[in-house]
From Swiss-Prot:
Organism: Hyphomonas neptunium (strain ATCC 15444)
GO molecular function, one term: structural constituent of ribosome
Protein's recorded name: Large ribosomal subunit protein bL36
UniProt gene name: rpmJ
Keyword Ribosomal protein attached: yes
GO terms, biological process: translation
Lineage, opening ranks: Bacteria, Pseudomonadati, Pseudomonadota, Alphaproteobacteria, Hyphomonadales
Length: 41
């Protein structure tokens, strides 16, 4: 899992990437390729 201050560029790395909010944090999740996971902060 990568930690970045901005997730906008990480969302465009793969077409299945989605941005979700969980417990006040912003995550990028990817079901088909989990190595694209990222967290904002």
């Amino acid at each position: 899992m990568k930690v970045r201050s901005s997730l906008k560029s990480l969302k465009s790395r793969h077409r299945d990437c989605k941005i979700v909010r969980r417990k006040g944090r912003v995550y990028v999740i990817n079901k088909t390729d989990p190595r694209f996971k990222a967290k904002q902060g």
